[in-house]
């Protein structure tokens, strides 16, 4: 008799504990959005709807704050639709350092991002030679739309420090021609480097004007706000919305 009572009490205790656990899990799910869920930095409308071939190029001598934007950059990559292909590269000391060749493994591409060195030793004379080199890696076949995201200060001082030399540079024009021939739309996020664009307003103006021309003449868009550094969350939201609108009108 005592054994039956003990078993009954134990069963009741187990049921009560299980009910409590379920209640706690439900509350936790409500608060966090589910197990492992994280609040997204990107608006639902910014998620790319159609598969994309995307090359992301980052200038390696950008200010250290750019390193804080890697998480939202990874989030953008991971949110791309299935069938998308991503390449990641860094423009450093006049060379293109490819961290990840074009791949459909979006997680692998996201993990290939690293913090820019943020050193003048990594400064290129201009980013456009490496932009053209990256463009040559796009396939000429396939149905995906082609896009390149350049995160850079845009400044070209290889042939002098003046407006004409920067905005009408030979390397910039070559990059534009290559992008057009391969049907690659170039988008850009402005960020200052540790060099001239971190303190010289003329340099900022030259760089932003060059980025604007590059994007405008290739069917993309340049994103910058004033002359100071701006976090990338709003840029990625606008980028996704812009690409979706362009897809819808094609």
What do these predicted regions represent?
Residues 24-250:
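Scaffold/interface architecture of coatomer-like assemblies
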Residues 10-20:
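Bacterial N-terminal signal peptides
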């Amino acid at each position: 008799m005592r054994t039956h009572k003990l078993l009954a009490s134990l069963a009741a205790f187990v049921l009560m504990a299980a009910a409590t656990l379920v209640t706690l899990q439900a509350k936790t799910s409500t608060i966090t959005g589910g197990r492992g869920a994280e609040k997204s930095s990107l608006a639902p409308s910014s998620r790319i709807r159609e598969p994309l071939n995307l090359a992301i190029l980052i200038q390696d001598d950008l200010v250290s704050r750019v390193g804080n934007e890697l998480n939202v950059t990874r989030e953008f990559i991971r949110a791309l639709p299935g069938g998308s292909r991503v390449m990641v590269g860094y423009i450093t000391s006049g060379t293109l350092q490819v961290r990840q060749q074009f791949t459909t493994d979006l997680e692998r591409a996201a993990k290939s991002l690293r913090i820019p060195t943020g050193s003048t030793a990594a400064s290129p004379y201009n980013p456009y030679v490496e932009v053209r080199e990256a463009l040559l890696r796009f396939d000429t076949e396939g149905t995906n739309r082609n896009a390149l995201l350049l995160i850079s200060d845009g400044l070209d001082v290889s042939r002098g420090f003046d407006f004409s030399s920067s905005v009408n540079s030979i390397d910039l024009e070559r990059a534009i021609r290559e992008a057009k021939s391969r049907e690659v739309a170039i988008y850009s996020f402005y960020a200052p480097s540790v060099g001239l664009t971190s303190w010289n307003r003329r340099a900022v103006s030259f760089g932003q004007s060059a980025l604007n021309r590059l994007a405008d003449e290739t069917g993309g868009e340049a994103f910058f706000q004033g002359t100071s550094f701006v976090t990338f969350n709003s840029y990625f939201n606008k980028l996704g919305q812009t690409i979706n609108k362009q897809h819808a009108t094609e």
